[in-house]
Amino acid sequence: SAAEPTCDTIVSAGTVKVLTDQGWTFEEKEFVVGGVTLADGLLCFWADYSVASDHGQLYGWSTISAEDAASAQSSLLAEGWTREDGPDGIYITENPQFAMGTDEDGYGMTYLFGDGWVKFADTRQGLILIEWAG
């Protein structure tokens, strides 16, 4: 059977090493996309839990049906998120005015919807680190 995704396998081994070398660990959260709860999904919040801080990194991955993907996308767009079509799927990005943090291209939290899956990171560049293919 295919391996189940876990917080230390959905992102690249190099990413896990960098984060754990910093003393960071992860907590698994419920992965909810535009009001759609993805029971098979995984949302991972990496942080240094030995200090009181909201500084961390979020990575998510899940399988998703076409119906759920359409519903999640329309819900996010209705909340003011923006859509960009890319070669690898549909990017849905939060309004940068409300972003906690952005990458050097100005993108904050971003979902990438592919064929039967969705990825999430707290910046669009962060999506590159999610290597899980399901």
Where are the regions a protein language model picked out?
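Extracytoplasmic low-complexity, Pro/Thr/Ser/Ala/Gly-rich segments
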Residues: 1-48, 134
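Long, charged/polar, surface-exposed segments that mediate recognition or autoinhibition
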Residues: 48-92
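Intrinsically disordered, low-complexity segments enriched in polar/charged residues with Gly/Pro
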Residues: 3, 30-31, 69, 96-99, ...
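Short small/polar-residue motifs
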Residues: 42-43, 77-82, 104-109
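Long, continuous compositionally biased terminal/linker segments
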Residues: 43-57, 64, 107-117
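Extracellularly exposed regions in secreted/surface proteins, prominently low-complexity, repeat-rich
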Residues: 87, 92-134
